[in-house]
Amino acid sequence: IFDFKKIDGAFKYFLNKYKFTVVEGVGGILVPLKQNFFVSDLIKKFNLPVIVVARFGLGTLNHTLLTVEKLKRDRQKILGVILSGKKNKNDISVKSNASIIKKITGLPVLELGYNEKVDLEKNRWIIK
């Protein structure tokens, strides 16, 4: 499905041409791109720093912590976590997930609702 020679060439081109390049994780670090080659392998191959992006709400702790655990096990550079989407203010998990993730992982966590702007001065870790 994927032409990995073209993908390799495109990655090398963009990573060398631009100071800042964003690579979308296409659904998670364990999404297979081909047999026995996952998004996590692509991260390793190009030594990409990672920002874990997760939704607010129930289930986020589990998949975010598993993702961070896998990245740490693979010795990947994790810049932080962004929780994004709709904030249901009546959901206790929405109120507590960011602080729990920060406490357990030691990573910076940014909560970003729909159409909210990011203060890059307060969140410099995003553009390292």
Can you say where each PLM-predicted feature lies in the sequence?
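Short glycine-/polar-rich loops that comprise or flank the Walker A/P-loop
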Residues: 46-49, 77
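A contiguous pocket-lining binding segment that forms or flanks enzyme active sites
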Residues: 49-55, 59
